[in-house]
Design a protein with these regions (language model features):
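Non-catalytic terminal and connector segments of soluble metabolic enzymes
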Residues: 1-138
Length: 138
């Protein structure tokens, strides 16, 4: 019985984050997974999808007033993306930790401000909105 209680407690203490591998970078999927794994993150869900323009608008609605918004949305629809839900137990600020990993990957593999390998949610509210674009049951 102790094992069941421990498993329930551990599952309740898991933080989840949403990450999207942008068009043109699907070849880095394993690299991204391995980098997250180095810090104790595991993939709980993943999917690939070619976004519709309306979905890209949903994904980046916080940037709708920015000059780059139209180009960013068009770029995100240009080819297949791969989305991930990563999870990790017992972490205080998952979005801060993931931002550090994201910036490291962008620095190493990014080609420009827009073609910067991946996007990650910066809050629970953003994650709920963004993950729903890729995962039906979110």
């Amino acid at each position: 019985m102790k094992h069941l209680a421990q498993a329930i407690n551990e599952s309740m203490n898991k933080s989840k984050v949403f990450v999207v591998l942008k068009p043109g970078f699907l070849n880095l999927a394993q690299t991204v997974i391995e980098r997250f794994a180095q810090d104790g993150w595991t993939v709980s869900q993943t999917t690939t999808k070619k976004l519709l323009l309306a979905e890209a608008h949903t994904l980046y609605k916080v940037h709708r007033k920015e000059d780059f918004y139209k180009d960013l949305c068009e770029y995100m629809c240009s080819d297949i993306c791969r989305a991930f839900i990563f999870e990790k137990s017992n972490i205080l600020d998952p979005f801060k930790e993931v931002k550090k990993i994201k910036e490291e990957i962008r620095e190493k593999y990014g080609e420009s401000d827009m073609r910067n390998v991946l996007h990650s949610s910066d809050s629970q509210k953003a994650m709920d909105n963004e993950a729903s674009v890729f995962f039906n049951c979110w």
